[in-house]
Amino acid sequence: MVVGLVRLLRLSNSLPASLLVLLGARLADAPLHNQRLWLAVAAMWAITAFGYVTNDLSDQAEDRINKPDRPLPTGVITSGQARVVAILLFTCALLCSAPLGLAPFLIALLALGLLTLYNRQLKSAAGMGNLLIAGLAAGAFLPGVVAVYGWQWVRLLNLVPAVLGLFFFVLARELLKTVEDIAGDQAVGKRTFALAWGSQETRYIIGGLTVLLFGTVIALFPWWRYAWPTTALMLIGVVLPLAWTVYSLTPQASLSQIRQCLALLKGAYFVGLVALWLA
């Protein structure tokens, strides 16, 4: 049960997502001991975990094919238990965001609503859901700055390179996931990006996003005076694995190869976090 709950909450993904709030605050020179900042971190974790739990509730049919070892398909966690967890996370997100002010509270409520909409409808909207997830992920840099300083646009603008870089990277990885999940999504009649456009066309889009990420790192990072180790680490540890993924995603690529690429990109994501911490 405990292991199943840990997997349901996707701690390896939801905790790093909450750390993006801290990272954004650091990039804006905010004091990391600020209580409001940690409320924003907790709210982001609850929102992200809520998204994963409701995703598993919505995807049970296809997960029996694509991810049969997940807690709901295996029966380790029941649908009823998962719904209770989702309600608790929803409540936690709102309770943590409420002390930060009306605007942060409404933004948290909007994020929860968008994640629910994604899991119920947008995931089948051939790219719309992927854009939403990438946007929400990239936006995770901002709440910490707002929690500490309010809407100080000069500080928020300093996050532009990091936000753009994360958006391109997450969108590329999200599109690759649609290739991984073709079998299950096709079986339940979903119209994901890979099913609508084909795996090779998806590869070309990922290639384009790789170029955009490369351009962001080369042009914007030095322009915004991010430290040079950040640029070097991003190129070697993030852009290069993404380029390798594009190279590997041939028509003959097996499911295991696609999953290896996804694992590589997950590692690249953490390298990117370290790189930005050095910025």
Q: Which residues make up each language-model segment?
A:
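C-terminal ends of transmembrane helices
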Residues: D56, A61, G113-A126, E174, ...
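Small-residue-rich segments of transmembrane alpha-helices in multi-pass membrane proteins
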Residues: A17-G24, P73-T74, L131-V148, A194-S199, ...
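Extended hydrophobic alpha-helices typical of membrane-associated regions
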Residues: V3, S14, P222-A279
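Functional transmembrane core segments of multi-pass inner-membrane proteins
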Residues: A28-A40, I133-I182, Q186, S199-V211
